[in-house]
Amino acid sequence: MQTTLGPRVRTRFAPSPTGYLHVGGLRTALYNYLYAKKVGGDFIVRIEDTDQARKVEGADQSLLKTLEESGIVADESILHGGNFGPYMQSERLDTYAQYCRQLLDQNNAYYCFSTAEELDENRKLQMKQGIQPKYNRKWLPETMGGNMPQSEIQKKLDEGAPYVIRMKVPDYISIMFEDIVRGPVEFDSATVDDQVLMKSDGFPTYHFASVIDDHLMEITHIIRGEEWLSSMPKHLLLYEFFGWEAPRFAHLPLLLNPDRSKLSKRQGDVAVEDFIAKGYSPDAILNFVALLGWNEGEGSEQEIYSLEELVQKFSLERVGKAGAVFNIDKLDWIEKQYIKARPVDQIIQAIKPLLQKELAEKSTDMDVARISSDEYLTQVIDLMRERVNFENEFITFSNYFYFDPETYDEAAVAKRWQDDTNEVLAEFITELEESDDFSADNIEAMLKAFVAPKGKKPAFLIHPLRILSSGVGFGPSLYHMLEVLGKQTVIRRLKKGIERVTV
């Protein structure tokens, strides 16, 4: 069967609006986008909402929003329009009915009046007999090689009995195609069921509508998950029934858990929106999913890619057949690299709304104008960039830069406090109050000079100073942290702390 089309590449991502965007869906969308953009082609997003029972209101807009937040902007969609619309399948029902009528007239499809109970009974019987469940063709008309008289079919139609329309799969033929990822693939039509094309509610099935739309929208390459490979015989037969040239197909490897089981929505958070809500950035997520099945090739150690680099370097020939393991540790590492490299102004733009929300919900003893300033936030970012895992942690994990601690790490206090700690701290607070230089270097020099005559090591004060200033026993360089917090804030916190912490 011929599977090549004209020179302009057109790919599509066709999600169902049944919920959030699965990470596997993001990968499919990305690979379609990259393949089209690399050669100057078009990327289309089509909403496949033929299953009205599972349709979630607003999910179509949410899917497109998530894609665009990740940098994947469609050339044609329900948002952007285009010359091949509508891009919502529920708005194309007349088109599907027209092509279904053509298949009926050609004896490539037939009416089926079997009830759900009959179908279930037939399926159970076949399974008991060890036969692969398939429709038993009870309603296949005599004119198509079946046993049902046309008069019986017409009688049911006249009575207004509910029906579906099924395709007639040819008997005992070989169905072959060349998959871009998997190479030659062959099916025996004897294993293929007479697929339902039109449901009793007048809506087409995915299999029928997608073939019609892919042809009418001039899609040249269909890049989708491996789970659709078993549907290929039905799709290729439909192209043949209509006399249409089929696009080229590429079936991507499954996404797997570390234990090699299939990554599933039922196993927890696998929606892109869930990862974004946890603090992962869209560009890091996109980079991560790009590597789930694709690699640049031997000799390349690069793992961090911009979208522009991916467009330049991506090829379906470098997509593997084996399942791709979804390793959350790898995503964490990629996110960390993005935070390290992200310009300060971008981080400030992202975290300012979070800080403003915190300040609106909670009072602070610090100067709000100062801690909200770009200058102050830049200092916090420079100090914490190596320590945070997500952008929002510049606020949440670094809370003590904006609010005085309400509690102190009890384990750290128990470990670091001695009988005379508060007494020595009080003396050092006086030293700090009298100093006009609150730079990190001077604070360090003062501390070392202060403890030496007392026969103590710097650590005697370093840890208590950190705990009383931040509430926790770990963090960035103490001296730089104190400098960023500022003299007024540090002295206030230390005085408050020695009143509250006792051994």
Curated annotation (Swiss-Prot):
EC number(s) recorded for this UniProt protein: 6.1.1.17
The molecular function terms in GO held by this entry are: ATP binding; glutamate-tRNA ligase activity; tRNA binding; zinc ion binding
Residue positions annotated to bind ATP are 265
Q: Which family would the database say this protein is a member of?
A: Belongs to the class-I aminoacyl-tRNA synthetase family. Glutamate--tRNA ligase type 1 subfamily.
Name where it mostly resides: cytoplasm
Q: How is this protein named in the record?
A: Glutamate--tRNA ligase
Motif: 'KMSKS' region; annotated at 262-266
GO biological process terms held by the UniProt record: glutamyl-tRNA aminoacylation
Catalytic function, reaction form? tRNA(Glu) + L-glutamate + ATP = L-glutamyl-tRNA(Glu) + AMP + diphosphate
HAMAP family assigned to the protein according to its UniProt record, in alphabetical order: Glu_tRNA_synth_type1
Compartments where found:
Cytoplasm
Q: Cross-referenced Gene3D superfamilies, in alphabetical order?
A: 1.10.10.350, Glutamate-tRNA synthetase, class I, anticodon-binding domain 1, HUPs
SUPFAM superfamilies, alphabetized? An anticodon-binding domain of class I aminoacyl-tRNA synthetases, Nucleotidylyl transferase
Arranged from A to Z, the UniProt key words for this protein are: Aminoacyl-tRNA synthetase, ATP-binding, Cytoplasm, Ligase, Nucleotide-binding, Protein biosynthesis
Enzyme class name: ligase
- PROSITE patterns assigned: AA_TRNA_LIGASE_I (PS00178)
Q: Where is this motif: 'HIGH' region?
A: 15-25
One cellular component term (GO) for this entry is:
cytoplasm
Role of this protein: Catalyzes the attachment of glutamate to tRNA(Glu) in a two-step reaction: glutamate is first activated by ATP to form Glu-AMP and then transferred to the acceptor end of tRNA(Glu).
Summarize the subunit comment.
Answer: Monomer.
